[in-house]
Design a protein with these regions (language model features):
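Conserved class I S-adenosyl-L-methionine
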Residues: 159-187
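A short beta-strand submotif of the Rossmann-like class I SAM-dependent methyltransferase core
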Residues: 131-134
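A short glycine-rich, Lys/Arg-flanked "PGG" loop and its adjoining helix->strand segment in the class I
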Residues: 142-157
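A short acidic, Gly/Pro-enriched loop at the edge of an enzyme's catalytic core
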Residues: 117-128
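Class I SAM-dependent methyltransferase SAM/SAH-binding core
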Residues: 70-78, 82-117
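Conserved alpha-helix/loop element of class I SAM-dependent methyltransferases that forms part
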Residues: 39-57, 74
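Conserved glycine-rich SAM-binding loop
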Residues: 67
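A C-terminal cap/extension of S-adenosyl-L-methionine-dependent methyltransferases
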Residues: 5-32, 193, 205, 211-215, ...
Length: 287
């Protein structure tokens, strides 16, 4: 599947990325093909959610924070007639992504080294912009949203998924926090929960939340649909497939099922949504 040159790029990237982020790719326990196959399955689920959400066929698509390209691969497979761009600040990741795309036979993908805060594209260029668990990692959230709005075409869409830091849980480090937790307090709580050297990872996190993002949407004259409302309301009446991801990783799912069992999940869900008190952000934004 992958040429030897691409495999070497992968292994070089894995060596340096351990010093840059929280991820440990389990490559010591599994081979590279296993890792790629597993990540592709996850990205295919993401692409499916986006295609269900965005009915319009996009011509030009941008994935912000594309890393080594998994979401772009699945999006390009879903939209075969589209041109897909991935932008990623990690130069080594871009090299891996471009080489992997070539080996896998993708003709409609291009990976660019750059930042979400200074997108190297003209105004009104993209029909669809994707920010999948990335906005909490950028240096300047406000500038990144401004740039998305600038390069998005009229009637174009932005798909945003991210943790909600009003919810008292930090998913990257798997620690309990407080609503709207400050970074110093988050570090303190991480140490109490015996997080080791990864505590420093908190320094580059941006504690995004619906209030912050909706203010930026309004500033840029964007319309938005808070898809989390639909997601959790449907779950409260029995459609739990969209929250099944929490099943093995969060007490949220256990509490959800308990409150559902005793018959108070509907009013609790409505109250939680009103207070923006839920685990993850999910927006469809339109220009």
């Amino acid at each position: 599947m992958l040429k030897q040159e691409t495999k070497l790029l992968w292994h070089e990237w894995i060596k340096v990325t351990r010093d840059r982020c929280h991820l440990h790719f389990e490559l010591e326990k599994n081979d590279l093909s296993f890792h790629i196959e597993t990540c592709l399955k996850g990205s295919e689920r993401t692409a499916q959610r986006i295609s269900e959400d965005i009915k319009k066929e996009p011509k030009f698509i941008l994935d912000i924070g594309s890393s080594v390209g998994f979401n772009c691969f699945s999006i390009a497979k879903k939209y075969k007639e589209s041109k897909v761009f991935g932008i990623e600040p990690d130069e080594e990741a871009c090299k891996v992504a471009n080489s992997t795309a070539k080996d896998l036979g993708y003709k409609n993908i291009e990976f660019v080294n750059g930042l979400g805060e200074t997108l190297p594209f003209s105004n009104n260029f993209f029909d669809l912009i994707i920010s999948h668990t990335v906005i909490e990692h950028v240096k300047n959230v406000d500038k990144c949203i401004d740039e998305m709005a600038r390069v998005l075409r009229p009637e174009g869409y932005i798909h945003i998924e991210a943790p909600n830091y009003i919810w008292p849980w930090e998913p990257h480090l798997s620690i309990f926090t407080t609503p709207l937790c400050s970074k110093p307090l988050m570090k303190f709580l991480a140490k109490l929960q015996k997080v080791g050297e990864e505590v420093s990872y908190i320094d580059h996190l941006q504690p995004v939340n619906p209030i912050w993002l909706e203010r930026l949407f309004k500033k840029n004259n964007l319309k938005w649909d808070n898809r989390a409302n639909t997601k959790y309301l449907l779950a409260s009446v029995g459609e739990t497939k969209d929250i099944a991801a929490y099943k093995n990783s969060s007490v949220f799912y256990k509490f959800f099922l308990f409150f559902k069992k005793i018959g108070i999940i509907k009013p609790l869900t409505k109250l939680a949504l009103k207070l923006n008190f839920y685990p993850s952000i999910l927006y469809t934004v339109k220009k």
